[in-house]
Amino acid sequence: MRVHEEASEDKEREVEEAPDLMPLSPPPTAAATAAVVAVAGQRLVVGYALTKKKVKSFLQPKLLSLARKKSIHFVSIDETRPLSEQGPFDIILHKLTDKEWQQVLEDYREEHPEVTVLDPPNAIQHLHNRQSMLQEVADLNLSNAYGEVCTPRQLVIMKDPLSIPSAVAKAGLTLPLVAKPLVVDGTSKSHELSLAYVETSLSMLDPPLVLQEFVNHGGILFKVYVVGETIRVVRRFSLPDVNIYDLENNDGIFRFPRVSCATNTAEDAEVDPSIAELPPKPLLEKLGRELRRRLGLRLFNFDMIREHGRKDRYYVIDINYFPGYGKMPGYEHIFIDFLLSLVQNKYKRRLSGS
């Protein structure tokens, strides 16, 4: 299994983002796969149905330039026209949450099994609800010599904010609690979170939502990106730890548009090596492989934290489909290699007659 690291572009990135590449299995070389495309005598056509914001962040000039060199052509899909009248496509990339579009894509998959859809709409739906999002991690019950992977204890609140304090007490959850919107629909609002320190502030929250026990983790979060058979780990600052003083002197709700907005105060902080140390590679390899299989997805990331004071206990706190790969160092080469590997696998199946 090939494992290598990329050097940071500058000293600041070296502190803020510590990338690490881990193929889950030995991938084909880009040159070998590009040769398959050449032998097939055709371009690889990738149709995409993405929001304008996603197009801007993902289809960056460097990615498009590299794609052209590898005979990969990205084509925008017109949602107002029948999908069957467009293309033909070899691969379809999508991240639209409209239910009508999801059904169109499901119908297209049945009619055109030769087209690779990234990813199946029915598999993506699993990540649109935070009640079910982490269930596969919990069911995995991953524990080995390298560590233990858990999920925070959580509670779903559908309505009636006034009932939240009693529901929390009945469930036995320990404050502080992180509140997240129940539904993940791709909007910025669905990534907002709130931190509640005391029971009396819970009724100020806005259901439907998920309440998760806050786990002190040294203010460091590990973003683990999955692209097919490869994963990349990026270390980032997160919400700071909560202490007794915080619990005794904060009685409101602290709201953050997203975790990254809560990290500004930690940008210049010195990072304790024991806190910043990346999770063990074998543990991430196992977790990435199992989640890929259980979720039925090839493009996702998950947020992972290490419990402060517990070197071998980790928590997965969120999973996202088709995340912001544009923020991942070196994503262009990783993604192009992934697309080419899909072609090679398809070509091998044709040769074998399967």
Curated annotation (Swiss-Prot):
The keyword ATP-binding applies. This is Inositol-tetrakisphosphate 1-kinase 1. Its cofactor is Mg(2+). One of its GO terms (biological process) is inositol trisphosphate metabolic process. Belongs to the ITPK1 family. Mg(2+) 1 binds at D303, D318. The keyword Metal-binding applies. One of its GO terms (cellular component) is cytoplasm. Residues 1-16 have a biased composition (Basic and acidic residues). Monomer. Residues 140-347 form the ATP-grasp domain. Binds 2 magnesium ions per subunit. Mg(2+) 2 binds at D318, N320.
